[in-house]
Amino acid sequence: MGFSLTDYAPYDFANRRHIGPSPKEMGQMLATLGVPSLEALINEALPEGIRRRDPLAFGPALSERDTLHRMRELADKNTVLTSLIGQGYHGTHTPPVILRNILENPAWYTAYTPYQPEISQGRLEALLNFQTMMADLTGLPIANASLLDEGTAAAEAMAMAQRASKSKARGFFVAEDCHPQTIDVIRTRAEPLGIEVIVGAVDALDPEAVFAALFQYPGSYGHVRDYSDVIEALHGARALAVVAADPLALTLLKSPGEMGADIAIGSTQRFGVPMGYGGPHAAYMTCTDALKRSMPGRIIGVSVDARGNKAYRLSLQTREQHIRREKANSNVCTAQALLAVMASMYGVFHGPDGLKAIAQTVHRKTARMADGLTELGFKVDPQDYFDTITVKVGSMQGVILAAALREGVNLRKVGTDRIGITLDELTLGRTIEAVWRAFGAEGMVYDKTRMVYHLPQEMLRESSYMTHPIFHMNRAEAEMTRYMRRLADRDLALDRAMIPLGSCTMKLNATVEMLPLTWPEFANLHPFAPADQAAGYHEMIAELSQMLCDVTGYDAMSMQPNSGAQGEYAGLLAIRGYHRARGEGHRNICLIPTSAHGTNPASAQMVGWKVVVVKSAENGDIDLEDFRAKAEQHSENLAGCMITYPSTHGVFEEIVREVCDITHAHGGQVYIDGANMNAMVGLSAPGDLGGDVSHLNLHKTFCIPHGGGGPGMGPIGVKAHLAPHLPSHATATGAGFGDAGAVASAAYGSPSILTISYAYCLLMGGAGLTQATKVAILNANYMAKRLSAGFPILYANDKGRVAHECILDTRVLDKIAGVTVEDVAKRLMDCGFHAPTMSWPVAGTLMVEPTESEPKAELDRFCDAMLAIREEADAIAAGSLDAENNPLKRAPHTVEDLVGDWDRPYSREQACYPPGAFRVDKYWPPVNRVDNAYGDRNLVCTCPPVEDYAEPAE
């Protein structure tokens, strides 16, 4: 047999690694659909009028090896010095056991938000640990499971305080020693809501003039102050107190709760999460019990399952935007779950004694640094501090900063005559000596045996914290590794099975895309370091911005929004700024279809707009006549509309251009939600359809993993006329920045995870990205075809095609057998699947999105499982299965069910091994169905007492 060349391309990442179905499988799927080619299917699914004419101009795809080489080139252009800038960002040591077993572990980073608690018990416990740690440290009983960053958390606290305060004042006081970036984010949030931000000295605060006040603790310039008297005065005026507290400092200092604070916020970045040039990190929020229903973000609570065993779940969801829409507490959806898990594990790893020891070491080194500078003749402020000092240097500021740079150290420029210095757990004695040299010392040596303290005695913490046994476990690495493994094994993530959540795009997060994230050159840069030290970052961001402009048809891109919801908010601020610049600031009406994401109306409310709801037609499209009538009715005040494309019903609407034209004709701007961009990349572009602004969910379309509920990124693309109104930031100017104010603490949001999306674009190239979109549409239509044998497909176009997702009308099961959509979701767990999106956008249905990454075998396994569920419902309807005591109503089934007494009228085999379930590698849900009502009636959002963990006696 002669030697012949193969046409197999092993390094073709797009077609061999990212896209699931093989060419042979695609042929089989196309045959099932009755179309001769993939292009023929796309022609049937997409209206001709929305197709883009030019291919993506990305250049050829790179191999994994070449992509890593390019990432290394960029990394080498970053210069990582020792940053003692502080301002809320600190050097930290990520314990390798946490780095490897959490951040680099797909069992953790590929999971979805834990809406299905039975298959999310591991990360729910880790997030409950986070809440417990923060509640204990801050001395306040209620904690949420993270917010986006400290600045956003402060803005959310302001809005929360306004909702809850009994004061009629419109002012919000911000202490002048709060972090500057926090003040900027607060100003941006306050202005559209008509809140007056009063920045000033604490001693000048008039409690009667404000509904709440924010204090930094310790202050940005180092001051440690007891705010008890000020808070008491605020309460006397019926106003609330918010304290932005450093969690490491709270191991040594009196807690905000002990001072009487109503709300505490801050960042947990220094708990083992790298700075990443600004993010991502988990912010926290805690509050008094009286304010719990006003709190934004996710709250993990303790409930029970059907057997009465302890189980965790998301609590008080009626506060959230997917239910309350424009009346929601916040538009926050994605937060920072993965980073909160890392921070919680840092707390478990060190325990309270370890955290206190780290804090004492940091303070002792800071005190020694200060004493040395005092010996050199400099005036050091304040007298009492934790880790930050400010040095009066007069006209020597520039000389000293430059000298420190030569020593490899970044210091903070404060005003024109001061320098700020913040130490952290990584600060070495030789770094302190280098700073002394920069200040002119010769031969001064750091003596680590010299004990110096500068904490006020009356402020030292006496209350206990982190007393739960989980923070006192054996911290040998073997036990830590096993604990994290046990939690991971309780969860169902993409490393086990497809997660076909509609509108969530749970696609492959390739290992090669994730690798550069943890490289020191990307991970260890301070966001306020001199710009020339981040040249690699800036080059990458500029290239990625250009790629995304090509994808979307827009002219400019802002990378600052660090979630999809923040992207919506920033996009609407751009529209608002545009109207105001043209003297039309009165425009405040936003048209939003009934089928819109719940974040849309919540975001509109945040910029001070009024929401006018537009009906949907019977085929799922926007009701064009209703849209036209309402645009005409509100023509004088129309700010814009928010639509999703393809629609949230999973269909490419042919009327999209007409909707845009109507909006523009009445003076409005068009916001096209980018949640469904996975159906458009390379085939259509929102900017070409008439959109003025869109956000992209990089954690959906561009491969940033969901992390069990964050991180995410929501950059916005805009047409040229909106570019002057993009977000701004005090530390950055130029392309991608405008005049809208800051919407995140860091200029580029969470830039370290942009490495993932950038690598994805390099690996795929323009042709690969376009092929991925086509296969996403193929997979969805193949599943719709197979599943139509058991369930009506609720919406399709006139050719019977869907976009990248489809809605299964599972209400038919309720009609014939009393089987609810929740029963179906729980039964899918027995099959080893996470349920599709439940009851949205249509109550009682499932929205299925397989993405391009799933191979045919996994699609078929899911279809087999769903069709078997239909057969079980038919058996109930026929009377061969009991109406209540059946596999659907009792799902999910656990090992405890299997080994216990079996008194059910169906077999163990039928319960635990339905079609679709693996036999050898079966996933076992760790708990039975969770009682949601019990969890809300009996809210517990910190770790339950140790007795609850005890195994029941025989």
Swiss-Prot record:
Keywords: Oxidoreductase, Pyridoxal phosphate. Gene3D superfamilies: Aspartate Aminotransferase, domain 1, Type I PLP-dependent aspartate aminotransferase-like (Major domain). Its EC number is 1.4.4.2. Disulfide bonds: none annotated. Its cofactor is pyridoxal 5'-phosphate. Pfam families: GcvP2_C, GDC-P. GO terms for biological process: glycine decarboxylation via glycine cleavage system. GO terms for molecular function: glycine binding; glycine dehydrogenase (decarboxylating) activity; pyridoxal phosphate binding. SUPFAM superfamilies: PLP-dependent transferases. The glycine cleavage system catalyzes the degradation of glycine. The P protein binds the alpha-amino group of glycine through its pyridoxal phosphate cofactor; CO(2) is released and the remaining methylamine moiety is then transferred to the lipoamide cofactor of the H protein. HAMAP family: GcvP. Belongs to the GcvP family. The glycine cleavage system is composed of four proteins: P, T, L and H. This is Glycine dehydrogenase (decarboxylating). It comes from Dinoroseobacter shibae (strain DSM 16493 / NCIMB 14021 / DFL 12). The gene is gcvP.
